[in-house]
Amino acid sequence: MQTTFTHASPADRVLCPALRERIMTADQAASLIQSGMTLGMSGFTPAGAPKSVPQALARRIEAQNANGGNFRISLWTGASTSAELDGALAKVHGIERRLPYQSDPTVRKEINDGRMQYVDIHLSHVAQYVWFGFLGHLDVAVIEVAGILPDGRLIPSTSVGNNKTWLEQADKIILEVNSAQPAELEGMHDIYYGAAVPPKRKPIPMEHPFDRIGEPYLHCDLSKVIAVVPTQQRDTLAAFTAPDVDVPGGHGQCRARPAARAAAAAIGCGQYCQCRAGRLEHRPV
């Protein structure tokens, strides 16, 4: 697929005339967020998480709370995010409630110290729960995209997560357009708009790994977009640490179970999972 952009500057990746009129700085966008709001932000690990607006919001929270305020928000994401998002907001004690998953040490301390409510819900359940209204109202979606087409379609960034649901359910939308993300992301994604909530849900029509059942773009109601923030910052990815755990039954070492045939496996997060995954390279094929 031919990409719309090459190496355009951040503002040049906003081709929709109506949305070009809403371009502003991260600080201006953060000023539109009020205490008590629930925010749905992009990000599945640090990949595709907004960078500029969360940090600007953290500065706004810190300044208001230093003057006796109690500025806090609820934060929903696709999964764990980054130091620029989770870390920045947690350091200023700005998160009242967090879901569905986190791995930031400052967030973890806030939760364990009782300063942050945490809903430890399975990632795959979040979108459906939001559609059913179980988790309450979503005020603002803050979504990183790689570009905006003339008709307002959004080129997803390096993750999708719950972005489709946030864009559809939120009252207002803030878009971070990150020109540091490769233009070649256009066409990579497969966003499926045929799903429905139970009892009207039907099987997803995908039978083979190379099937494409959706489209490469996200959609949103342009009238809900209150800010477009150009940015140029790469995802911050942490390096894997060397496994340092003893696995029960592994005689003090992490060992892969012998198997006659390789089976499908889903590798999770943490030292134990890294240890298991690292041992797979030593298994006979």
For each predicted feature, which ranges?
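Conserved alpha/beta enzyme-core scaffold
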Residues: 1-285
